[in-house]
Amino acid sequence: MGFSHITHLDLKRFAGLSQRTSNALEMTEERRIPALWDQLWKQDMSALLSQAEKDKSIIALYSNYEQETNGFYTFSVGTFQEYDDILPGPYENIDLPASAYAVFTSRIGPIEEIVLETWKEIWTWDKRHLRTFTGDFEMYDQNAAVPQRAQVNIYVAIKK
């Protein structure tokens, strides 16, 4: 599907598990993102989800970029929280600044395919020069509940 629309989101507080990685590292056997997802599912997630609505989305957050798409960044998996909630370790609390976001919607398909396909589209998007690299995220809501027939939205921070 691809680019959907532009939206503005206020400051958000994220809580989750984090790991430093890079796109180059994620293309090797040393990739870290799959292990972080595994770690999240093995955790007692009640602290993350206890204050949530029943349909709280899981968020994959990309933040603290070193050199835009070429350097290291922090990859985190967790949820958005109420701003005054700070969760204790092992969860990292990250504030995502208010920003305009370009929203990209994946096609429906196997989750391991559609997410990378959508990121490849973002990397070649004709307005990619507008990216601010202040924090981007993938939203896994009820549309991603069936891994073989998933659809996700990816929010990319941009200059307005």
Swiss-Prot record:
Pfam families xref list: GyrI-like
Xref: SMART domains: AraC_E_bind
InterPro entries xref list: AraC_E-bd, GyrI-like, Reg_factor_effector_dom_sf, YobU-like_regulator
Domain of life: Bacteria
Signal peptide (residue range): none
PANTHER family named among the record's database cross-references: TRANSCRIPTIONAL REGULATOR PROTEIN YOBU-RELATED (PTHR36444:SF2)
The name this protein goes by in its record: Putative transcriptional regulator protein YobU
Lineage: Bacteria, Bacillati, Bacillota, Bacilli, Bacillales
